[in-house]
């Protein structure tokens, strides 16, 4: 039945929006106000697979009542979240009330209120476990709690068999065009190097187009007290970076380029460094299973007071490949070559193992003789 801009469908109906595709019954929707309801709904909201007793359809958000969420496509998910109510702003954030976090049929923890950013998908609501030669076995968990419309408190908790408890805490304000973050605690980079921020204030201006050009730019500003095992310094870091849209040289060949300028200042020794950066890479897909790539990274001055997040090689040539044996196993190799000193800096060997809705990554750095592996939820 229809009346003006409204529809009522008692039988099964499919609601499709740019970021939503759900099927349910007893659907009522008003095209004028872009509001409606649906019972026994199931489908996709953003990248979340959802099931709900009923769902409210609103112009800027969707509200699930007695809902379940997961990214696992299995009929019986390996992990999921259930909640009395979930409010999802697609591409922005979600807030779940009386949330329970399940692995298979076991509740591993619960939260009265839980928030997750959907802008960056690098933070999982489920624990990550792993091992590294430097820190031993570890378990990490990221948690976030809303304090206002755009403000949240967060805790990034990690326990390591060698390094022990390494927590970090803070607050983040996510606005439309930028993020403001205050962080305090222990942070680790991809080379297992630690720093303590006491505290750090960070401004991230999100990617924006440069006029009508095929170029985007970002800006990051950092000010805070950094401490390692031997020194402390009030650290300042400002970087403006431009990224060219990928250039498709052919259906299987893609060129990427980016450049920027960074200024780093330290109170410890009064240093101030200005550095030009340039990065480019060429990716070739030979088949659905095999691809190769080569890259070049240039940093004008890579001398820094702290090793944390520092650039290891000023003039670096990279080349490598990935090969997918089957849907479960992929291997990768790449080499970092120091052009300035004419030497191999490092060889990286990686094995990716698909564990259904989880992924294991095992990496060995041959020159440093360092091993690390982790298991985390698969990013679908």
What spans do the regions from the language model cover?
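Surface-exposed beta-strand edges and flanking loops
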Residues: 2, 40, 173, 184, ...
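Outer-membrane beta-barrel "beta-signal"
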Residues: 349-359, 363-380
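Transmembrane beta-strand segments of outer-membrane beta-barrel domains in Gram-negative
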Residues: 181-275, 279, 283
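Residue-level marker of positions within ordered structural domains that often coincide
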Residues: 60, 90-91, 176, 208, ...
């Amino acid at each position: 039945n229809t009346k003006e801009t409204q529809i009522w469908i008692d039988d099964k109906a499919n609601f499709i929006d740019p970021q939503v595709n759900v099927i349910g019954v007893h659907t009522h929707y008003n095209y004028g106000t872009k509001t409606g309801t649906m019972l026994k709904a199931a489908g996709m909201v953003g990248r979340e697979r959802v099931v709900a007793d009923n769902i409210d359809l609103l112009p800027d958000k969707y509200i699930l009542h007695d809902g379940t969420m997961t990214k696992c496509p299995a009929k019986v998910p390996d992990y999921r979240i259930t909640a009395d109510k979930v409010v999802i702003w697609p591409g922005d954030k979600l807030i779940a009330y009386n949330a329970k976090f399940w692995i298979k049929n076991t509740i591993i923890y619960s939260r009265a209120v839980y928030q997750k950013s959907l802008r960056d998908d690098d933070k999982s609501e489920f624990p990550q476990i792993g091992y590294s030669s430097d820190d031993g076995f570890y378990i990490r968990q990221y948690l976030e709690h809303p304090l206002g419309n755009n403000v949240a408190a967060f805790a990034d908790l990690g326990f390591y068999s060698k390094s022990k408890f390494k927590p970090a805490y803070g607050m983040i304000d996510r606005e439309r065009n930028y993020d403001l973050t205050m962080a305090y605690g222990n942070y680790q980079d991809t080379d297992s190097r630690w720093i303590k921020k006491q505290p750090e204030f960070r401004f991230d201006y999100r990617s924006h187009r440069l006029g009508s050009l095929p170029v985007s730019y970002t800006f990051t500003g950092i000010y805070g007290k950094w401490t390692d095992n031997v020194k402390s310094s009030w650290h300042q870091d400002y970087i403006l970076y431009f990224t060219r849209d990928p250039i498709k040289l052919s259906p299987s060949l893609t060129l990427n380029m980016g450049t920027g300028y960074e200024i780093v200042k330290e109170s410890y020794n009064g240093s101030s460094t200005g550095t030009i950066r340039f990065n480019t890479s060429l990716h070739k897909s030979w088949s659905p299973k095999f691809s190769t790539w080569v890259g070049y990274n240039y940093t004008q001055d890579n001398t820094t007071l702290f090793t944390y997040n520092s650039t290891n090689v000023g003039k670096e040539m990279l080349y490598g490949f990935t090969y997918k044996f089957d849907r479960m196993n992929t291997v990768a190799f790449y080499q970092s070559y120091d052009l300035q000193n004419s030497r191999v800096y490092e060889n990286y060997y990686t094995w990716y193992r698909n564990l259904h809705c989880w992924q294991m990554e095992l990496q060995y750095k041959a020159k440093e003789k360092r091993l690390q592996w982790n298991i985390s939820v698969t990013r679908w």
